[in-house]
Amino acid sequence: MGNEDFLNKIIHGDSMKLLDKLEENSIDVVLTDPPYFLDKMDNNWDDDTVSSTDNHYAVKSLPAGMKFDRKHGIKFYEWYFEIAKKIKKILKPGGFFFSFSSPRLYHRMGCAVDDAKLLIRDCFIWLYSMNQPKAMSLNHFIDKMEVEEEVKEKIKDELDGWKTPKVKSCFEPILMAQKKQDKTYLNNILKHGVGLFNTKVKIGEDMFPANVMKIEEGHEILDRYFLVPKPDKEEKGEFNTHKTVKPLKICEYLIKLSAFSDNAIILDPFVGSGTTAVAAKKLNKKFIGIDVNKEYVEIAKKRLENV
């Protein structure tokens, strides 16, 4: 099986297995949003496990009731290290790897990609404000204390406003890495058609490409450069049940920034509802999308039909 069996298709399957079937040194850009936790199953999941769950979706943060443990981060590192090694193998020399992450696990992702011998180039920041604070009051636990009510009320008054150490999350990091180029940048772009950034690409007005992007209106000056629309129902599709759909504009921006060749292949090994593939198709680039979730594969295919 070669790339021709994957090109411009959404494939249902496990990327840990399918990435080995892609040709070496053949992918221009990898743009993906990997799963971190899947219904309290960490990364020990497969198609049968996903299909047997009631709510089979990948989420960025911990599922309700699940406590974060260092083991989760370690398991994620071990899993993504193997993924990153496979990605390095199939990327062209100078090819780019963009991976959405979360503040809590970005360091594990960065170490996994770095240890796979890909070059960490930068970190893009996607800013937003539409998110709920997750800090928790301790009143519920105070109520369970076996002490007099007056003592409970006194403790509550003393701890008024003091909650668990969790702030409102307002950004999402996007790791940017690159496979080592073949000799010089000039040699690499002429031989492999990848490895440079298109500095004419802007999110806003009259500014060199930046690594900060925001999706809501705010400061007037920032809005000139970093405004990225939040995906609405029309963009996602009324049928789209995916929980963490990324803005199409961000994916388009990263592809336009990094994909030089007209024949560039954009790979998303965790394609979800297909935003990366939709962006690539809109920009007349070739794409490969892979996902273990059958429901998301069908959603992605349906979204592509509307492009």
Locate each region found by the language model.
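Class I S-adenosyl-L-methionine
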Residues: 7, 28-32, 36-85, 96-99, ...
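Short conserved loop adjoining the S-adenosyl-L-methionine
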Residues: 18-24
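A short helix-to-beta-strand connector/capping loop
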Residues: 3-9
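Enriched but not universal
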Residues: 1-2, 296
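Conserved SAM/SAH-binding loop
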Residues: 12-17
